Amino acid sequence: MRFNHFSIVDKNFDEQLAELDQLGFRWSVFWDEKKILKDFLIQSPSDMTDLQATAELDVIEFLKSSIELDWEIFWNIALQLLDFVPNFDFEIGKAFEYAKNSNLPQIEAEMTTENIISAFYYLLCTRRKNGMILVEHWVSEGLLPLDNHYHFFNDKSLATFDSSLLEREVLWVESPVDSEQRGENDLIKIQIIRPKSTEKLPVVMTASPYHLGINDKANDLALHDMNVELEEKASHEIHVEQKLPQKLSAKAKELPIVDKAPYRFTHGWTYSLNDYFLTRGFASIYVAGVGTRSSDGFQTSGDYQQIYSMTAVIDWLNGRARAYTSRKKTHEIKASWANGKVAMTGKSYLGTMAYGAATTGVEGLEVILAEAGISSWYNYYRENGLVRSPGGFPGEDLDVLAALTYSRNLDGADFLKGNAEYEKRLAEMTAALDRKSGDYNQFWHDRNYLINTDKVKADVLIVHGLQDWNVTPEQAYNFWKALPEGHAKHAFLHRGAHIYMNSWQSIDFSETINAYFVAKLLDRDLNLNLPPVILQENSKDQVWTMMNDFGANTQIKLPLGKTAVSFAQFDNHYDDETFKKYSKDFNVFKKDLFENKANEAVIDLELPSMLTINGPVELELRLKLNDTKGFLSAQILDFGQKKRLEDKARVKDFKVLDRGRNFMLDDLVELPLVESPYQLITKGFTNLQNQNLLTVSDLKADEWFTIKFELQPTIYHLEKADKLRVILYSTDFEHTVRDNRKVTYEIDLSQSKLIIPIESVKN
């Protein structure tokens, strides 16, 4: 078990004394160490009679004895306060060593009054076995009263807002878009959950098109057939223009202004990180945007009309937009309780909306926490001129997602009024996204947030799994690289798939975000010493490290051929039985592919030295095929039996994370380190007619040519003599169209290479 603390802010001794005093620990530097220990235990919500101090004495006996307090005894007691079990989790007499091996913060100095006070201060900042830092656990046990006012410790807000007194309101915000050209601004339903307090509250907002319901049946009916032949394309240049939808002005009309919303709600999905912030004095707002249940408009799916329907909420919080108590617009309501400062949170589509909102430069959005977000929708459903489904969802496309999230049709009355217009616009979207060619076009350009990163004002916090093949790592990497030089940004890169990380045991993620949001949303100093990149190591249990950047400038080139004359060949076509088997279950195909049982060329490379990949690996291939159209798929494995982190978190303890005071209890989880025969490092796909994004070229049969394309970016450490397995093939039954033509691909390995960005030891 190893803990990684990134949320702890260094404080001088006077600051420590002042903060401890506010918690009720009022100590003098003239007290001896044992008196301070005794008072610490008396003031705490723990029962000191349960604690063991030495191999022979419990704490009560120790305090009565003449034995002096030393660091070993301190850690015997401290570990128990952190929920470690003496004689089982750790050995009495070896507590200091156990704490050091667990990476717990320690004072490496002699035992003095000042040092023991500092030790208790940092102990309160330390993670318990259950994943909560000690001070937050004790506050949840009643260390401070629920007075609905802010209390801070180590630059973090504590859970002193009463979750039993939360206000829950439903409002309709007037957006600056008319997504169906009705001649009226679309109204957007929002749900607000906020503490009952006289304080002016900041907002943690989650923009989720899923929030008010999804239409699974419409989604399934809209799925595209993947068993189709690749289209041959005429050579041409692609032209796009940068444009944004014009914002509409609201129609001014004087209305009565009320203080309270008549509509309330009781149930609904909430993000547990937002719940955590609720009890710490941050309001939560959930907004689903245009084309969703009880709102107006069409589900425009990723364009700036959808984004503006989300940022309208931030405008309302800052007095620049209007909100109403009902869709009838008879009464207006102001955000008089809000301080106007907003953070956006959420994973996947939710993180995507955060990226998009940030690129509008909307005033009041101070920071985004974009988890597994999409920065360019083309790169989610396409790759290098090829239709490429996101991992786990073959046949999905943006029109399918629109059908899923157009939740207005879930209400019968709205279905009657709006379905005909919806069907017309959905058909237009299907045509515009152009599955036939797979090329970039104006439709996708309008859904590319990367071209507007120069407008970003908010601080950017990125969370992404390097084993996420749904929303692939390039989405985070590209946004990271596109931000202007010097922009405030940090990335948390974990080894999981498409998952949240705010309830993991090994890292104080929620507390780190707490310190960041407190500074940005409550006008306090940002003293958090956060590195640019916080990386979970790929072959160690519960180890996180710091890096300077995502993407290295140094490269090495590994030739794919072992001799001067070296060729590889694979066929595209499968017999009917195999084709049907793989089409039915792409996981069967993936297993066969990784074990060299599919139609593929496999090149195994033994590494001559240790290296860390940092960025997108590039393939440079010399090849030919016996057709005038074709596509290439590539995957690279870390091949060979060894321990690696799984990409799915496992529960370590149930319902032990208290988000407030017995509020929204959450499971403690972690990625396990397990034996495995291989692990996917990266993969990529390309249409051989698309050597760059905006050019389509002719492909000549039986003629050699060279192509270069990047695979997904990653950071991955490999040891000397580790084996890289490079897999080259055509049809991928999870991602690409299932083209079963009889095409043979031949690769000149002697003229082909792997170009790897590598991390310097210094970084």
Curated annotation (Swiss-Prot):
Q: Which organism is it from?
A: Lactococcus lactis subsp. cremoris (strain SK11)
Under Enzyme Commission nomenclature, its number is: 3.4.14.11
What is the recorded function of this protein according to its Swiss-Prot or TrEMBL entry? Removes N-terminal dipeptides sequentially from polypeptides having unsubstituted N-termini provided that the penultimate residue is proline.
| PANTHER family, A to Z | COCE_NOND FAMILY, PUTATIVE (AFU_ORTHOLOGUE AFUA_7G00600)-RELATED (PTHR43056:SF10), PEPTIDASE S9 PROLYL OLIGOPEPTIDASE (PTHR43056)
Q: What are the catalytic residues?
A: 348 (charge relay system), 468 (charge relay system), 498 (charge relay system)
Q: Where in the cell is it found?
A: Cytoplasm
What GO molecular function annotation could you give as one example from this UniProt entry? dipeptidyl-peptidase activity
Protein name as it appears in the record: Xaa-Pro dipeptidyl-peptidase
Q: What family does the Swiss-Prot or TrEMBL record give for this protein?
A: Belongs to the peptidase S15 family.
Check the UniProt entry and state the signal peptide residues, or none.
Answer: none
The UniProt catalytic activity note for this protein reads: Hydrolyzes Xaa-Pro-|- bonds to release unblocked, N-terminal dipeptides from substrates including Ala-Pro-|-p-nitroanilide and (sequentially) Tyr-Pro-|-Phe-Pro-|-Gly-Pro-|-Ile
- Record's GO cellular component, any one? cytoplasm
GO biological process: one example: proteolysis
Q: Which keywords has UniProt assigned to this entry?
A: Aminopeptidase, Cytoplasm, Hydrolase, Protease, Serine protease
Record text on subunit structure and interactions: Homodimer.
